[in-house]
Amino acid sequence: MMKSLASAVGGKTARACDSCVKRRARWYCAADDAFLCHACDGSVHSANPLARRHERVRLKSASAGKYRHASPPHQATWHQGFTRKARTPRGGKKSHTMVFHDLVPEMSTEDQAESYEVEEQLIFEVPVMNSMVEEQCFNQSLEKQNEFPMMPLSFKSSDEEDDDNAESCLNGLFPTDMELAQFTADVETLLGGGDREFHSIEELGLGEMLKIEKEEVEEEGVVTREVHDQDEGDETSPFEISFDYEYTHKTTFDEGEEDEKEDVMKNVMEMGVNEMSGGIKEEKKEKALMLRLDYESVISTWGGQGIPWTARVPSEIDLDMVCFPTHTMGESGAEAHHHNHFRGLGLHLGDAGDGGREARVSRYREKRRTRLFSKKIRYEVRKLNAEKRPRMKGRFVKRSSIGVAH
């Protein structure tokens, strides 16, 4: 039925649509080898991008009758030149769309790009904190601002207004040179410069501290003079022996005293300057304390109670051996020297009180000395071994692992 209808329409000069066979064909698609009307051509070639690229030919309308009769009856005018081709064109012509570019770019885009570049460069720049440069820039900005119109800041007379015609209305918003100078002076004083270096000691509150230090030095000098005078007087008298309390205290408990002194110094620093001066005075008084023994008064009070010597024989006292060393030592040599002097004088301190106390003290000191010495040797050996041991990234490494790594 469709073929007969198409052949019936094809018998005329016009060609029917191959798709709907109802309307006259207006387009010929070589890729599809089909004659299509307007509606069918639009629906077929809008289906996908591949169909849109098909090349189509616009068919002309039927010519006059004379031209129709001049042509051969078996061949139509529209069929001349058309041959059957492949459904997909091989290397067909492509429609090149002309894209026009502005040869001269707009000025606004260039300015915007340059401004962005300048901003990116300024981000990585170090600001120049120079007072001279800032002042110069400030003066230049003031000169540029003078070009703006005038606005009076307050109600003035006509003469004053004439004098101020050269100033800008924006000058009131910026500080003057006097204000800038005052600001720089304040900044210098805050930073430690300027006139701050010439403040007197009394203004800073250090006068009282200096006075206290001077008084302490004078008191120390007086105490040392008194001690020297007393030592000289003791040397001249044959029967007076002065035992320095500080010396005995330091020889027996030297290490304990050092710890106590450190604690005392820490407490003194926290208490303040006034309490520190009072503590120093008390320490000087303790140093001035001395133990004296007058043999004449002892013998007179002893009377006829018997011989005062425990050995029943008076010991020979060598006055040259009575003097004690002025320096204090925490070593065992000074302690032994101190006890040897007492034994030479016949004064046995351990026998007067507890008989075994002296032996216990000596054993304790010997044990402490050997323990400290052994600990020191042990730590030194560990330190040397640690320095010789191989390390890798700050940690000890076994020698076997080093050989494997190499």
From Swiss-Prot:
Compartment list: Nucleus
Zinc finger (B box-type): 17-59
Key words of the record: Metal-binding, Nucleus, Zinc, Zinc-finger
GO molecular-function terms, A-Z: DNA-binding transcription factor activity; transcription cis-regulatory region binding; zinc ion binding
CCT domain segment(s): 357-399
Binding annotation for Zn(2+): 17, 20, 40, 45
UniProt entry tagged with the keyword Metal-binding: yes
Region of interest: Disordered: 63-95
Entry's family note: Belongs to the CONSTANS family.
Name listed for the protein in its UniProt record: Zinc finger protein CONSTANS-LIKE 6
Organism this protein belongs to: Arabidopsis thaliana (Mouse-ear cress)
Gene name linked to the record: COL6
